[in-house]
Amino acid sequence: MARANPRRRATAAKDKWKMKEWFVVYAPDFFGSKEIGLTPADEPEKVIGRVVETTLKDLTGDFTKGHVKLYFQVYDVKGQNAYTKFKGHTLARSYIRSLVRRRTTRVDGIFNITTKDGYKLRVMGMVIAYRRIQTSQERAIRRIIQDIIYKKAEELNFADFVLQSVNGQIASEIAKEARKIYPIKRAEIRKIKVLAEPEA
């Protein structure tokens, strides 16, 4: 079987790369429609579906938010512009590790919720208590995480729920209530995943 000439293969690959265009990727409206990256493709259709990762620091300029990772998926391309929708967020593992030290208790809660405008999300909340706590206290704190997340989902539309999650507002409410049970170090919404969008 004849083998392709390595030089020809390299030239073909180079030519294919030259044919690609760069598309500017934008965040959704509720994140200010800011530019979040560039992506290459030889056809606009190939850009659709791509997921772009950025941080809240890059979007807002707030250097304290570098640990908040955001994921956006391209759903539409017009000209050289690619438009995205929010797919989820997570906190950097190194940040979470920095919170969880010896003699602390990590309380997690994972909940499937529906926002006021019909988006189905999986939301993961987390509270770090300063010391080892009793099982009853752990249950009480987990219930607080659950109650506040469900309450916010009933009150807020998708965009506002996401914004209040990633900027720490919902976590602040959780922390305020959890401190009535036991002194805590930190509360966070550590992850959101979009499960389903409302039917058009």
UniProtKB/Swiss-Prot annotation:
The answer to whether the entry has keyword Transcription regulation is: no
The similarity annotation says: Belongs to the eukaryotic ribosomal protein eS1 family.
Which Pfam families does this one have?
Ribosomal_S3Ae (PF01015)
Does Flavoprotein show up as a keyword for this record? Answer: no
Q: What keywords does the record list, in alphabetical order?
A: Ribonucleoprotein, Ribosomal protein
> Single GO molecular-function term?
structural constituent of ribosome
What name does this protein carry?
A: Small ribosomal subunit protein eS1
GO biological process terms held by the UniProt record: translation
Q: Which organism is it from?
A: Thermococcus gammatolerans (strain DSM 15229 / JCM 11827 / EJ3)
The entry's cellular-component GO terms read: ribonucleoprotein complex; ribosome
Q: Which InterPro entries match?
A: Ribosomal_eS1, Ribosomal_eS1_arc, Ribosomal_eS1_CS
